[in-house]
Amino acid sequence: MEDFVRQCFNPMIVELAEKAMKEYGEDLKIETNKFAAICTHLEVCFMYSDFHFIDEQGESIVVELGDPNALLKHRFEIIEGRDRTIAWTVINSICNTTGAEKPKFLPDLYDYKKNRFIEIGVTRREVHIYYLEKANKIKSEKTHIHIFSFTGEEMATKADYTLDEESRARIKTRLFTIRQEMASRGLWDSFVSPREAKRQLKKDLKSQEQCASLPTKVSRQTSPALKILEPMWMDSNRTATLRASFLKCPKK
């Protein structure tokens, strides 16, 4: 799973996921499913923000090619992926500027158009079950919840999906692709089922023990070049390092 994650996600997303797990004292070598889940969640958050701006009239617009003459403001402030201290500083600044109620838990985004914090969820289970779990944890009507699944389903607070259909379809397509790529490598079942994941981990550890005493032959063959997909972020100093092209999983 770790190899899959490193091949299929943008290196900056992988780096952010590594930092997040380290911050909570989790070992990505063991918690490989969580590693994959964090990377997926980060990517969805960034895709949610992609191309969405507020024009001079205060209207929400979608711009994919960027007009250097347009005075545009990012519609969404990305909070997910930031250091916790910085994230809370950003939230405090937003609340002081907009008058928004400060959330008890770190949300993922802030929507400047609708003036609300957003909690993004990506689930391997039923969307309504995960939605209820999120709502029960947050316990705030001020934070908007939007849940996506790997099967193309989604659920949002008061059926308000925030984004246009095309933007949401882009996210759903990416999640479905991740699911297909995992399935083709025999990783999907363990990603969905914790019991299967534990069984697979024990199997891998046993296999490593059996191979430890065998002679090792070093391969000089280089890894296949990763193909670059269409960039999903526009030029901006705020998230420049994160707007590199997404990487396509190399086929085995």
Curated annotation (Swiss-Prot):
> What keywords appear on the UniProt entry?
Acetylation, Decay of host mRNAs by virus, Eukaryotic host gene expression shutoff by virus, Host cytoplasm, Host gene expression shutoff by virus, Host mRNA suppression by virus, Host nucleus, Host-virus interaction
Q: Name one Pfam family in it.
A: Flu_PA
Q: Which GO terms describe its molecular function?
A: RNA binding
Q: Which GO annotations describe the biological process of this protein?
A: viral RNA genome replication; viral translational frameshifting
Q: Which residues carry this modification: N-acetylmethionine?
A: M1
**Annotated site residue numbers, Important for efficient shutoff activity and nuclear localization:** R195, K198, R199
In the record, the effect of L65S is given as: Drastic loss of shutoff activity
Q: PTM per UniProt?
A: Acetylation of the N-terminus by host NATB is important for the shutoff activity.
Which InterPro entries does the entry mention?
A: PA/PA-X, PA/PA-X_sf
Q: Coiled-coil region(s) at which residues?
A: none
Superkingdom of source? Viruses
Q: Name the Gene3D superfamilies for this protein.
A: Influenza RNA-dependent RNA polymerase subunit PA, endonuclease domain (3.40.91.90)
Residues with site note (Important for efficient shutoff activity): L28, L65, K202, K203, K206
- State what changing E2 to D/N does: Slightly reduced shutoff activity
The family classification in the record reads: Belongs to the influenza viruses PA-X family.
**What is written about domains in the entry's comments?**
The probable endonuclease active site in the N-terminus and the basic amino acid cluster in the C-terminus are important for the shutoff activity. The C-terminus acts as a nuclear localization signal. The C-terminus is recruited to host protein complexes involved in nuclear Pol II RNA processing.
This chain belongs to the protein called Protein PA-X
Q: Lineage of the source organism?
A: Viruses, Riboviria, Orthornavirae, Negarnaviricota, Polyploviricotina
